[in-house]
Design a protein with these regions (language model features):
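Hydrophobic alpha-helical membrane-spanning segments
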Residues: 186-189
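Glycine-rich ThDP/TPP pyrophosphate-binding loop and its adjacent helix/strand module
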Residues: 1-184
Length: 221
């Protein structure tokens, strides 16, 4: 889709640049390579950003690719690439901006790999302790991009601990007030609406899910 949108911009002669993001696991899909090859061959204004958080659900990068980096996969398409610290806000900004500027000048696609780490589970059904250690997770604690950028802004005099505290309090207040407001509306939607809005007629699987969930809610009353 990204390559197609970028090509449409080129055909229409606009200055639009398409930026797509993909996980490290997503690069194992064939359309990733097909799209980049197409964009490179026709110099489409496309920028790919790979979020390499080192795990595709539970699959480590070591068994996803034989390449040293994901960024270097761009070599096969004759496109420039760069790997940056994905937890460094400014590094990511500069790398993506340079890629966008290059695409806007008609020089074709670029690939940016943001090397980072997924701190939590992939989903609520995922248990990271099965495939990685607590020590590994803790080694990334101090690399939190929000805390790092906050420290940078404070050191440069653009921000302060007082402003940060006030901002957090204001945001938490807004979240709590919004939650209470929504909660006050009550359950005004029938349960079945969650399952019947996608298809004209519910599929057998959706009907089964609906009945299962209805029974679960009834049992928890």
């Amino acid at each position: 889709i990204g390559a197609g949108l970028a090509m449409a911009s080129k055909i229409r002669k606009t200055d639009e640049v398409t930026v797509f993001t993909i996980g490290d696991g997503g690069t194992s899909h064939g359309e990733f390579y097909a799209g980049l090859n197409y964009a490179s061959a026709f110099k489409a204004p496309l920028v790919g950003v790979i979020q390499n958080n080192q795990y595709a659900i539970s699959t480590p990068t070591s068994v996803q690719t034989g390449a040293e980096t994901f960024a270097q996969k761009a070599v096969a398409f004759g496109a420039p690439f760069v790997q940056v610290d994905g937890n460094d806000f400014l590094a990511v900004y500069v790398a993506v901006k340079e890629a966008i500027d290059r695409a806007r000048k008609g020089e074709g696609p670029s690939l940016v790999e943001a090397y980072t780490y997924r701190m939590g589970p992939h989903t609520t059904s995922d248990d990271p302790s099965i495939y990685r250690t607590k020590e590994e997770e803790q080694s990334w604690d101090h690399k939190d991009p929000i805390l790092r950028f906050k420290a940078y802004l404070i050191n440069k005099g653009f921000w302060s601990e007082e402003e940060d505290k006030a901002l957090i309090e204001a945001v938490n207040k807004e979240i709590n007030e919004t939650f209470r407001k929504v909660e006050s509306y009550g359950a005004n939607v029938d349960l079945i609406e969650i399952f019947e809005h996608t298809y004209q007629e519910m599929t057998p699987q959706l009907k089964e899910q609906y009945e299962t969930h209805k029974a679960f809610l009834k049992g928890s009353e």
